């Protein structure tokens, strides 16, 4: 807070598999019980109340390999949490890997979005994870994610049109999540910077 942070990004980490390198992602993606979902929502509302007293906002990050990744799961969590206390951290890459349309999620929840992560997906690697016995970490290490404008899954024109026509004033954070030995960080940072300048004019 003392450094100017006003958003707290949080995620569900109680039943996750995304950090397990030997665990195939899709056959083992966790599903929360209704009791677990309600407990999570209750905890988020309480955290949101405490954050609000400090002038901060809690934003929940749906993440592949956790109990909240699908649109159905996002819908249920948003239904159970107070919009004044809990916002949404929107991530183009994770919503795509979860099998959802990020444009649909952003359209539906733009008024609750308080923080944004943008990254693209390489379909050929994603398909190997989706159809094989590969883990989330295997996918990351093998280039499943890349910077905006370098992949072939996210409809960036629609994403940015939604943002430009909204009242969103928060951060848009570019993520790459790639092996730096295979994808030079400077090269990809420059590629992302050029793409973001084209889309946003900044």
Question: Model-predicted segments: where are they?
Answer:
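Active-site acidic/histidine proton-transfer and metal-coordination neighborhood
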Residues: 1-88, 157
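Histidine-acidic metal/acid-base catalytic patches
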Residues: 45, 49, 53, 71-90, ...
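Short, flexible loop segments at the rims of nucleotide/cofactor-binding pockets, characterized by
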Residues: 64-65, 93-95
């Amino acid at each position: 807070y003392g450094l100017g942070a006003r958003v707290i990004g949080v995620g569900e980490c109680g039943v996750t598999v995304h950090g397990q390198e030997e665990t195939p992602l899709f056959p083992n993606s966790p599903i929360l019980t209704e009791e677990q979902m309600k407990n999570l929502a209750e905890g988020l509302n309480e955290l949101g109340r405490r954050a609000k007293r400090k002038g901060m906002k809690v934003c929940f990050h749906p993440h592949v390999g956790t109990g909240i990744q699908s649109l159905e799961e996002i819908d249920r969590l948003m239904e159970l949490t107070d919009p004044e206390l809990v916002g949404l951290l929107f991530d183009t890459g994770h919503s795509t890997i979860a099998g959802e349309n990020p444009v649909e999620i952003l359209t539906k929840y733009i008024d609750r979005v308080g923080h944004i992560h943008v990254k693209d997906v390489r379909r050929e690697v994603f398909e190997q994870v989706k159809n094989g016995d590969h883990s989330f970490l295997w996918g990351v290490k093998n280039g499943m994610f890349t910077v905006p404008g370098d992949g072939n899954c996210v409809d960036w024109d629609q994403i940015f049109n939604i943002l430009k026509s909204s009242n969103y004033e928060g951060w848009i954070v570019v993520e790459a999540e790639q092996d730096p030995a295979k994808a030079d960080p400077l090269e990809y940072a420059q590629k992302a910077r050029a793409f973001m300048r084209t889309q946003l004019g900044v």
